[in-house]
Amino acid sequence: MRHIKLDKGADGVAILTLDNADESMNVVSAEWLEDMNAAIAELRDDESVTGVIIVSGKKAFMAGADLKLMVAGYETMTPKDAFAFSQKATAMHRALETMGKPVACAMNGLALGGGFELALACHHRVLSDDPRAVVGLPEVNLGLLPGSGGTQRLPRLIGRKKGLDLLLSGRSVAPKEALELGLVDEIAPIDQLVDKARQWLATNPPAERIWDVKGYAIPEMRGMIVPEVAMDYSIGVAQVAGKHGYNYPAPAAILSCVFEGLQLPMDKALSVEGKYFAKLLTDPVARNIIRTTFISKQAAEKGARRPEG
C-alpha cells in the first residue's frame, strides 16, 4: 500500500495513517481507494484488532477528489461511468462502517469533501481545536453534490434541516461550531487527538451505526405525504429556484437527493445519491465550473499563459 500505513498495537488498536505518496495533501484517487479497501479487509479479518483510529500523515487531514483527474475523464464519461465512479468510494465507506469494529477518526486539520465523507463514515470523530481545522462538504460550489455518502450520513447525523443548510451552502465549519452542530464528537489540542480516540475505544463502543439498527427512522422524515415534510420540500425547491434559477442544477439535485434518500434504508439511499451525482458529473455546468474556478485559475497562477521572457 503506497498511500496508507497500518500499525497494529498489542492493545488491539490499529492506527491507519493516510499519507498519499508524492502529494502534499491526501486526496481521493483510484489507487488510494484500492489501498483503503485492502486495509479495511485486513483489519476486518484480523481477530487481534479490536478497534481502529484513522489519522493523517500530512499537515491537514484530507481533501476531496483529484479535480484534474475528474475533468480529464469528462469527454468520454457517461452517466453509467459516473455512477460506477461514485460507487467505488461509497462502497469503501460502507465497508468501513460495517466491518464490525469501531473506527475513530482523529482529524489534525481540515477535512473537506471526500475527506469529510470519510470522517462521516467513522463511528467517532475527534477534531483539532485549531481554527484552521475546518470541515465541510463544498461540492455544491463545483456544481456537484457529495458523491460518497455525504448527502445521506450528514442529515441522519445532525438532522435534515441543519444538514441541508450545510449541503446547499457548501460552507466550511470551524471546530467549535462543528462540535455544536454534532459534526464531530470531540475537539481537542492536536497532540491529544489520538489519546481521545483511544479513550473512546476503551469504552468498548458499539460498531454499528444508528441507521443500521433495525427499525431506525430519522425523526424529521415520516414520509413525503406528511404535510410538514411536503411543505418543507416545496419551500426548498422554490428557494433554490429563486436563488439559483434553473441553470444551476446542483442545489435542486441535493434537495431531491436528501428528501428521497432519507425515506429509504441506507444502502438504497446511497444508490439514489450515486444516480444524482452521476447526472451532475456528466453535466457541462459542473465541468465548466471546475475548469474555470480551479484548473484554469491554478494554471494562470503558475504562469501557464504568461508570455516567455
Language-model features, listed with the residues they occupy:
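Amphipathic alpha-helical segments at domain termini/boundaries
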Residues: 1-19, 24, 120-121, 161, ...
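Conserved CoA-thioester-binding segment of acyl-CoA-metabolizing enzymes
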Residues: 1-55, 91-94
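Hydrophobic/aromatic residues within transmembrane alpha-helices
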Residues: 54, 66, 118-119, 178
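Glycine- (often His-adjacent) and acidic-residue-rich active-site loop
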Residues: 56-91, 111, 141-143
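Glycine-rich beta-to-alpha active-site loop
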Residues: 90, 95-142, 146
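Hydrophobic, secondary-structure "cap" segments at the distal end of domains
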Residues: 151-161
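Long amphipathic alpha-helix in the N-terminal Rossmann-like dinucleotide-binding domain
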Residues: 202, 278-287
